[in-house]
Amino acid sequence: MPRSPRRWTPEEDRVLLDKVKQLFSDGAKNDTTISWATVANALPDRNNKDCRKRWSKITGAKKGSWSLSEDEQLLEGVQKYGRQWAMVAKGVETRSADQCAKRWQHCLDPSLDRSEWRSDQDARLVAAVRRYGTNWKDIKKFEFPKRSTTNLKNRHITLFRQRNKAPGACPGSTETLGPGIDWWSMEQGMIDDMSMDASEDGDDAEDDQTPDSYTSISTSSFDDILGGSSSSPSAADTMTTASPDPYQYLLDWAVPSHADLVQAATSYYPSLDGFLGSTYDHNAKIDSSLGRDANGGNFIPGFPTQTPSQFESIDVSQISDGIVSGEPSRQGASRECRAASNVSSGPQMTLTIDNPDPQTMTGILEVLAKANSKVTISMNRE
């Protein structure tokens, strides 16, 4: 069982720095000559790899994208030393042993599977996350031995974002949008792995191996890896993983028309029939302003999802008992929904909401419904 991730404390950092300083004063020339096992003896809950990685992090090892020359030096080091990462890092000079290990294991190893993801593999990945959580090391070991842990992590994030963008998927819903994919479990498994210390993530590099213990590495693909953009590691294999934005789905959808809001809110709050009135001055059929999936489905975030057949065929007369006239018009930039017969001639208030989102509109409509208010709702979608 993998150890539970645990953040480094200020006291542990102090002990680490003091111990490394002592070893430098005793003759160690750089971090590749330090006995990390000796350092770990001063920190009962940390091993030599934890200490080495933490040291690299807090002492400002070079970060960011790898240059072509660094990759070339890394490849040369692997050919010469195998997976003795301390020796490889000494040749690279600008990166730590653990950075070299991760760069190799996640990007440059010619045995990695960099092929496009298929739908059945996506389903397997989601099932694996449900079983193992976000322990990418175990998922790689048992499910995708040829994929890098970074590739697995990034694909999971991509699927999560696609799920939030997809028409027909309400955030937090349990419905399945693809064959065999349980999107709810994806959301439950989506955590910010990068918040943990680098020494504690699920895809740590293994400890340095001696020349007798590492498997011979094929270098026939090295030139392919470095020889041009067409064969460079894909974006899914890069070392930077962006945390998922839980509000991404709000940024990529058009704001729904007021008719969509009224129809959805009425189905959600039956009491709205009482104040929306019996005659509507707008299109006879719902004109959805949202995107459609391949099957013609529509979706309004935060509201119950209608089936495509229901959503595209419901007359407004089905919402309230009145006569609706007029043909659909798809040219206007704004829509109006008026409870014409119920609008009072007394004092009125105009409330303007910039960039309204469905959740806000739901709350407003609920308050108005409970107050039995007479309202005029309009939306300018310029």
Curated annotation (Swiss-Prot):
It comes from the Eukaryota. Keywords: Activator, DNA-binding, Nucleus, Repeat, Transcription, Transcription regulation. InterPro entries: Homeodomain-like_sf, Myb_dom, MYB_TF, SANT/Myb. GO terms for biological process: mitotic cell cycle; positive regulation of transcription by RNA polymerase II. Induction: Expression is increased upon exposure to hygromycin B. It is found in: Nucleus. Residues 211-240 have a biased composition (Polar residues). Disruption phenotype: Impairs the ability to produce 1233A and 1233B. Residues 194-240 are annotated as: Disordered. Its main location: nucleus. One of its GO terms (molecular function) is DNA-binding transcription factor activity, RNA polymerase II-specific. GO terms for cellular component: nucleus. Residues 1-57, 58-108, 109-160 form the Myb-like domain. Residues 194-210 have a biased composition (Acidic residues). Transcription factor; part of the gene cluster that mediates the biosynthesis of 1233A, a natural compound known as an inhibitor of HMG-CoA synthase in the mevalonate pathway and with antibacterial and antifungal activities. Involved in hygromycin B-induced transcriptional control of the cluster. This is Myb-like transcription factor. It comes from Fusarium sp.
